[in-house]
Amino acid sequence: MTQFRRTGAAVAAVLLLGSMTLAERQTQARPVAVLRAATRPDHVLIVVLENKRYDAVIGHRKAPWVNELAAGGANLTHFYAETHPSQPNYLALFSGSTQGVRDNKCPHNLGARPNLGRQLIDAGYSFTGYSEDLPRPGWRGCTHGGHGGYVRRHVPWVNFSNVPASASQPYTAFPRDYRKLPTVAFVIPNLCHDMHDCPKANADAWLRKEFARYVAWAKTHNSLFVLTFDEDNQTDGNHIPTVVAGAGIKPSRYPARATHYGLLRTLQDMYGLRPTGLSAGAAPLRGVRVGR
């Protein structure tokens, strides 16, 4: 939102050096030169998909829009998830820790532990998570909509008591006037549109329909779009697709190693927030040229 635009912050970008093992040993992050500093984004929209390794999506003919996005944005070619199964990776991205969760069980009630949503709100910014097939704002149930529907295990903010119920919205509330977006928004598609239960072509077509216009808008409105995955298809490598597009992003392939912790650290640095958990030991994503 324009009232929150501030300058002088090192922004968005690209590649984390260093990552965590599956046991989450903290490693010393090495410094990386920033190519460009720029204004803080007015909006960052993050869409999280499910369970696909990098080469099952990037370069695959059944995901044409995702590949268009990668060709026109920053394709982070060595981005890795933290662990298996799905749920702890969402928690890592949102809070800097898997919070000791090692399963997909529901519910996990994590109390008032630090997390990105609470940090943004406390700093005077705004946060909303939009979940497809969520039946109503603030709903805390585990599943809805049957096969291909909503699952709470993919919606990390619901597990934290210090994130207001009003920050958890059905995807039907996603604003089509993008100026009304919160500072940081997550979109969690249902199990069909996130590539989990349905063919990737279905998800790719849905992504194009829902977000192609936002990506074009973001390029001229100081905003960013991040597409990432929770994990790969259960391999030890856990190599996942991640693309950044929007204002000032230089289209290219970026080969430095990156993780969800580095992505979280980037968001925290953008908005002057204190790193949480293992994001404190992760270098922010750097190297993508950002600036207007």
Give the location of each predicted region.
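Secretory targeting and sorting signals
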Residues: M1-Q26
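Flexible, surface-exposed loop/gating regions in the mature catalytic domains
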Residues: R30-R292
